[in-house]
Amino acid sequence: MAEASFGSSSPVGSLSSEDHDFDPTAEMLVHDYDDERTLEEEELMDDGKNFSSEIEDLEKEGNMPLEDLLAFYGYESTIPAVANSSANSSPSELADELPDMTLDKEEIAKDLLSGDDEETQSSADDLTPSVTSHETSEFFPRPLRSNTTCDGDKESEIEDVETDSGNSPEDLRREIMIGLEYQAEIPPYLGEYNGDDEKAYENEDQLLWHPGVLLESKVKEYLVETSLRTGNEKVLDRISSGTHTRDNEQALYELLKCNHNIKEAIERYCCNGKASQEGMTAWTEEECRSFEHALMLHGKDFHLIQKDKVRSRTVAECVAFYYMWKKSERYDYFAQQTKFGKKRYNHHPGVTDYMDRLVDETESLGGTVSSSALTCNRPEPVPDQPLNILSSFTASDLTALTNSVATVCNPTAVNCLDDSFPPLANTPRGHVNHVPVVTEELLTLPSNGESDCFNLFETGFYHSELNPMCSEESERPAKRLKMGIAVPESFMNEVSVNNLGVDFENHTHHITSAKMAVSVADFGSLSANETNGFINAHSLHQHQHAALHSE
């Protein structure tokens, strides 16, 4: 009964004497073969049987010794030592010594399906061996894996894999070679080097300086003295008191050749012409102007700058000078005279500090060489924003300013120019495309007496023959301050040419370039007497307005 129950309860079925791989047939795949459904049908068929006797048999088998149990199922002991010690040991101890024979369905299926496909067709009966006819070693010729594999089994499997790959475990085991036994043996040098007869290699080194002979303080004094003798005192002045003195290899080499005689080394260093300069030599004014002119023409192409304008310098010196020049005041002046200076305020449209802008305009006007405005070939742009500082002039300020202008333009200075200039009536007017000319339509004077100082109009210029006076033509400054006059109509009615007391017959006056430009915000606050005193210092021509500019 126990045998029948054991055979019926086997989940796999009976296995043949030989180990075969399970290969489902086409019928099993088509009809969806299911082992569990077959087991359920067998259980339904055995419902009428009594399983109480089977339970009793299982209990008896649990109490039976291992040798009797193996003999009952047809097993023979393959290990004699185990058989001999079975009499002296309990069944529990023997069970611990035996490997765990509990296998899962998945593990058995993996082992059965992992072999080579030798036979394509087999049945379920061929998969299960006969339990009563063969030994355990014949059931499973290959080791089966279980859920309770110990670490020793894992190591043995790894060794088997390494052996199968062709490498022994000793070859795959790497050792860290540290110690005296692993060090390389360096043979002693057998040859001898003679400095007089032979050289270590073809290009022999040359000793330039030996630092252990003189004291460091004396060496520093020597370097400072050589710098002063060779014209590098400017470089030394820029060095702060806490910094070290820069080494000069050429000077130290001269000191070594003189056997560390400082006086002799200084004389030889200054006389042989090989003194190395610690900094770049100063650029002349001509070189600076040529560099700036070439920079405007070629941009930052220093090769063209050196080739075209500054041939006395190398390209490296031009590059070094450019970065020094960018940080100097000369660059600021250069930017004001070129397009860079004109675009400075355009890049910042939100500027509200007009005092700084007025100072810049004044510096640009005052820093240029005195030249005539009549030689200008293009009109200057009018500032975009009004200058509010001009509206703060009072009558007393204008009177003082007029007296200073009258002092500069005295009758003697004016008379000396009468022979050099033609009469004003015969002087041609300037071309409109070059210089804007003032006409009567431009003098828009308000009739209500309100100030209109911000309505600046263009200035008039007259061309004159200045060849006897000016031999060289210089450029106008890039930035000029435009000024105009707005006179109320009530003031013009009170003022007449006859009341001014000006003699037009004896003197002919001309506009010169040494006068200052003045803009009056409002003449409404001035009386007729003050106005006459203000205008008596000047000579008026056909127009009531004269634009005077100061270069």
From Swiss-Prot:
Pfam families: ELM2, MIER1_3_C, Myb_DNA-binding. The modification Phosphoserine is found at S52, S53, S114, S156, S165, S168. Residues 1-62, 113-169 are annotated as: Disordered. Residues 1-16 have a biased composition (Low complexity). It is found in: Nucleus. CDD domains: SANT_MTA3_like (cd11661). Residues 154-163 have a biased composition (Acidic residues). InterPro entries: ELM2_dom, Homeodomain-like_sf, MIER/MTA, MIER1/3_C, SANT/Myb, SANT_dom. Residues 17-36 have a biased composition (Basic and acidic residues). This is Mesoderm induction early response protein 3. It comes from Mus musculus (Mouse).
